[in-house]
Amino acid sequence: MSQLDVLIVDDEESIRNLIAANLKDEGFNPKVAANSTQALKILSEKPVSAVILDIWLQGSEIDGLGILEIIKKRYPLMPVIIISGHGTIETAVNAIKMGAYDYIEKPFNNDKLVILLKRACEVTKLKRENIDLKSKVIDKTELVGGCSVTLKYKMEIEKAASSSSRIMIHGKVGSGKELAARLIHKQSKRVNNPFIIFSPTCMTTEKINQELFGESEKQENNTKRPTILEFANNGTLYIDEVSNIPIPIQVKLLKFLKDQTITKPCGKNIKVDIKIITGTSKNIQDEVNNGKFLEDLYYRLNVSSLKVPSLYERKEDIPLLVKYFVKQLSKFSGLKERNFADETIAALQSYEWPGNIRQLRNVVEWTLIMNPLTTGNNEIIKPYMIPSEILANSANLTKLEDSFDMLSMPLREAREVFERQYLSAQMSRFNNNISKTSSFVGMERSALHRKLKLLSLHIPPTNRINEEEYEEANA
């Protein structure tokens, strides 16, 4: 089985070490924590596959149930098995209601814990696969949006599709690298042939080797079935997060790229014809410099490069994206279609979206689920209905000076404070595009320029739309 990270949280060192030793023997990679501070620090650095959590933690700021609550908020799919030597039926019921996978009393049988842990990980894996499948059904191959950044991006995809060269897609997590790969395949001459996705993340070296080349350290696992490279023959293979491939497999992949020939464990050579597209959210050049990625392999995969714009760069597409996600969620998940109020869209446009398109889709889905229709009418989604963290972090738009503070100011000063914050928020919303901001706020471009200068609001050079606007705004 793949080596899965498991966090063990228990204030008794002997129990932590005993569970860790047993799990290591079973092929898991255990991590240990004695209190809430250590546990949450480990999770923030890298989420684990499962957590074994004691309820009563002496010397801990937060008890087990408190940690469970935090885990379920931050990592909803992460399975948590509660252990306790002082538990009651009521405690067990509360833990399950809060989202724990199961509850087991100390002292417990090690075999029982391992079976429970394996089952929890398998159930979670199936849930993730189901979510991924639903996401693929919904997103498929449609790039929604019409802003200048998106139109330019669509043209770059068309050019990439017309080329037979290998392509490396660079983009932040959730920005849509897989969608770009699908679009390239869809617009290429290989459209009627297979499009295969391979994600090495969370796979062991042996598993990757077996999937790509059909080889395994265990002779009985040397499969006769076609490998992923064979399945992709005459089509397109998309390797997601390619930097996660271990060096030994990188060497084999490099050898394969030279002549696109697979040598099966039986000794048979198979020639294939595959367009290879790779995706990465990391700076591969840095990985090369740090000895984590083969330089020769990087150059062979990065023949053509495509950068996926972040949602922050495509804020003007948010109204269209929201409508698209609402329709798709209504169609595939049975959620009722709703309209988002203009002020709600404005709040969404003012958020920075570190999770990009994927995060926006999740926010739209969460909003529809948590705000069911109370009447038969299409109730408008108001700002207070979207997640509070979106409102709290929206750039300035929801942070206008408190009205009580303004009451203590003279009219001229209060008006200046409001205008500065209002225009700063609108400029951020429209990505510092003077033309679109002036159109929305109802001012002439020249008047807006003067007002920005008067309020000492400067357009950052890195975000300006063009040189003319920048020079005019900051003259």
Swiss-Prot record:
<feature type="domain" description="Response regulatory">
    <location>
        <begin position="5"/>
        <end position="121"/>
    </location>
</feature>
<keyword id="KW-0902">Two-component regulatory system</keyword>
<keyword id="KW-0804">Transcription</keyword>
<dbReference type="GO" id="GO:0000160">
    <property type="term" value="P:phosphorelay signal transduction system"/>
</dbReference>
<dbReference type="InterPro" id="IPR002078">
    <property type="entry name" value="Sigma_54_int"/>
</dbReference>
<dbReference type="Pfam" id="PF00072">
    <property type="entry name" value="Response_reg"/>
</dbReference>
<feature type="binding site">
    <location>
        <begin position="171"/>
        <end position="178"/>
    </location>
    <ligand>
        <name>ATP</name>
    </ligand>
</feature>
<dbReference type="InterPro" id="IPR001789">
    <property type="entry name" value="Sig_transdc_resp-reg_receiver"/>
</dbReference>
<dbReference type="InterPro" id="IPR009057">
    <property type="entry name" value="Homeodomain-like_sf"/>
</dbReference>
<keyword id="KW-0597">Phosphoprotein</keyword>
<dbReference type="InterPro" id="IPR027417">
    <property type="entry name" value="P-loop_NTPase"/>
</dbReference>
<comment type="function">
    <text>Member of the two-component regulatory system RF_0895/RF_0427.</text>
</comment>
<dbReference type="Pfam" id="PF00158">
    <property type="entry name" value="Sigma54_activat"/>
</dbReference>
<feature type="domain" description="Sigma-54 factor interaction">
    <location>
        <begin position="143"/>
        <end position="369"/>
    </location>
</feature>
<dbReference type="InterPro" id="IPR002197">
    <property type="entry name" value="HTH_Fis"/>
</dbReference>
<protein>
    <recommendedName>
        <fullName>Putative response regulator NtrX-like</fullName>
    </recommendedName>
</protein>
<keyword id="KW-0547">Nucleotide-binding</keyword>
<keyword id="KW-0067">ATP-binding</keyword>
<feature type="binding site">
    <location>
        <begin position="232"/>
        <end position="241"/>
    </location>
    <ligand>
        <name>ATP</name>
    </ligand>
</feature>
<dbReference type="InterPro" id="IPR025944">
    <property type="entry name" value="Sigma_54_int_dom_CS"/>
</dbReference>
<dbReference type="GO" id="GO:0043565">
    <property type="term" value="F:sequence-specific DNA binding"/>
</dbReference>
<dbReference type="Pfam" id="PF02954">
    <property type="entry name" value="HTH_8"/>
</dbReference>
<keyword id="KW-0805">Transcription regulation</keyword>
<feature type="modified residue" description="4-aspartylphosphate">
    <location>
        <position position="54"/>
    </location>
</feature>
<dbReference type="GO" id="GO:0006355">
    <property type="term" value="P:regulation of DNA-templated transcription"/>
</dbReference>
<dbReference type="InterPro" id="IPR011006">
    <property type="entry name" value="CheY-like_superfamily"/>
</dbReference>
<dbReference type="GO" id="GO:0005524">
    <property type="term" value="F:ATP binding"/>
</dbReference>
